[in-house]
From Swiss-Prot:
Name of the coding gene: rabY
GO molecular function: GTP binding; GTPase activity
Organism in which the protein naturally occurs: Dictyostelium discoideum (Social amoeba)
Name of the protein in its database record: Ras-related protein RabY
Motif (Effector region): 40-48
Example GO BP: hypotonic response
Modification sites for Cysteine methyl ester: C233
């Protein structure tokens, strides 16, 4: 049987994470459906939307997941499977909310702990349209992201400013990684080889220690026999 070829070149799973009320759902809706609502609705169920885009003459199919945040605005176990299978993350904070910016370090740490080794992430400063309410300076945010070597972009889902650009930036970085870095199976193979080498080294060290112990025991036995022989000669 001939299996049908997919109608895309790449399939990427993108997860949007960050504190509550940072506009994660609005970003997804604006990008996928070009809609926006001022009414806040808490994300209680895991859900995703699909969008196909074209980048560098490639057809990219995206699965975009809206994540949950628990009552402490932190990692929720319901998101674990999404973290493990995500190609990239949009880490969103609200530029009018200082706590959401301070919590970036926790979200980025969660990606390292629970995400794939080659997952790509970018930081998104959302609600850039609220100029008079802004409390996080753009230069401060960019400097922080530069120190972590993470791309940074400002968006407004309300005005549709840079919304598409933030997704395209993430996808281009994912594609760049795939072109320049080893795949996950290759990484796993390298890790297995390293583990095997370490095990072999440990076995060799154990064998050497056993040989040394045997030699010491033989020397002790020889010394004891020699002492007994000398004592026997003296008695005679």
């Amino acid at each position: 049987m001939n299996s049908e070829k997919p109608d895309y070149n790449y399939l990427f799973k993108i997860v949007i994470i960050g504190d509550r009320k940072t506009g994660k759902t609005c970003l997804m809706n604006r990008f996928v459906e070009n809609t926006w609502s001022e009414e806040y609705r808490q994300t209680n169920l895991l859900h995703f939307k699909v969008k196909t885009i074209y980048i560098d003459c490639k057809i990219i199919k995206l699965q975009i997941w809206d994540s949950q945040a628990d009552e402490n605005f932190r990692f929720n176990n319901n998101n674990l499977s999404n973290y493990r299978s995500a190609s990239g993350f949009l880490v969103v904070y609200d530029c009018t909310n200082e706590n959401s910016f301070s919590n970036l370090k926790h979200w980025i740490k969660d990606i390292k702990l629970y995400g794939r080794p080659n997952a790509i992430n970018i930081v998104v400063s959302n609600k850039s349209d609220l100029v008079n309410e802004k409390v996080i300076d753009s230069d401060v945010a960019k400097s922080y992201c530069d120190s972590l070597e993470i791309p940074f972009i400002e968006t407004s889902s309300k005005h549709s400013s840079n919304v598409e650009d933030c997704f395209v930036l993430l996808i281009k970085n994912v594609m760049k990684y795939l072109e320049t870095e080893p795949t996950i199976p290759q990484q796993q193979q390298q890790q297995q080889q390293q583990q095997q080498q370490q095990q072999q080294q440990q076995q060799q060290q154990q064998q050497q220690q056993q040989q040394q112990q045997q030699q010491q025991q033989q020397q002790q036995q020889q010394h004891q026999q020699s002492s007994k022989t000398k004592i026997g000669c003296l008695i005679q």
